[in-house]
Amino acid sequence: MARFSPMMLLPVAIFAGFAGLSGWALLRDDPDALPSAMIGREAPSVGEATLPGKVQLTDEMLRQPGVKLVNFWASWCPPCRAEHPTLTELSARLPVYGVDLKDPEGAALGFLSEHGDPFHALAADPRGRVAIDWGVTAPPETFIIDGSGRILHRHAGPLVREDYTNRFLPELEKALAAE
């Protein structure tokens, strides 16, 4: 019979330590914990592509007076579908501009036809180049832009529930109060 040695527990202890650290890292990960390098900078170009029959979003629109939102979305994105009613509500208060990310034209237009179009103007980003320039990691992401075209806040994830109420709305209200 083999004798028990404390060294036999070493591999188990090492594995448990790595598993614990990995779990802790996953649970504490907040997409906004590392702020976007774009905060305080002028919004990058939105490109020149749009969806047929929609108002073209231009770089000049981002520099017009007043607070506005730029939302990166896609019809294939479930969180984008979840936040769509919130965008519709917000569009009654301020301009909401959309950048359709890596979406076939027909799918994007079908989505907007079915669910409503909250966007005052749209850009299309079929290759994802505009999203890269903005530092977007995955849709949906929403940016608060000031009247001079500077990015004030980046919100990664859908604008829903407590996340919307506790993290996004205070930033939006702060931007609106500063105008």
Swiss-Prot record:
GO function terms (MF aspect): disulfide oxidoreductase activity
Matching Pfam families: Redoxin
Signal sequence extent: 1-25
Cross-referenced PROSITE patterns: THIOREDOXIN_1 (PS00194), THIOREDOXIN_2 (PS51352)
Residues annotated as domain Thioredoxin: 37-174
Compartment list: Periplasm
NCBIfam families per the UniProt record, alphabetical: dsbE
Protein name per the record: Thiol:disulfide interchange protein DsbE homolog
Organism of origin: Paracoccus denitrificans (strain Pd 1222)
